Amino acid sequence: MIRIFSLILFVIISNKAIASVKGETLICDKDTRGYNFISKDEVKISGINLNELNTFYINHSYEITENAIFIKQLLTALDKEETSRPIGWIFRRNLDYVSLDYVNDDWSRKFLWSCEATTSEQLNIRIKNKLNELIKVNGKKL
């Protein structure tokens, strides 16, 4: 009886550990995009706008499954739609990210890059360093 109870308790604890990414931070795409999971269903995406050479921060919702983290549409867009389609997903095993793009009335895969775990402080530092590097390179071209 104790073995069965221990097994059930272990399964419950393991399942909760797998199902939570709150507080985790990922940096992707050669330090140009980051994901800070700030709550159980909200992720703050930071990145570099390559056209304007500045940083942006956008809050999205996300859904976690056993194998992937689905990044959903903007939180403000969720108020308008009842069901939210994923705009990308991160594979939990290898931290590869796939982004979807809406082209010609259809969703298609747009990007695929790798992510790595980091801290939110390191995320901000690395994105700012990458932005400064891009500004220097762009300045030399002018």
What residue ranges belong to the model's regions?
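Sec/Tat signal peptide C-region and signal peptidase I cleavage site
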Residues: 15-19
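Central antiparallel beta-sheet cores of small beta-barrel/beta-sandwich binding domains
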Residues: 41-80
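Beta-sheet ligand-binding and adhesion/scaffold domains
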Residues: 32, 72-138
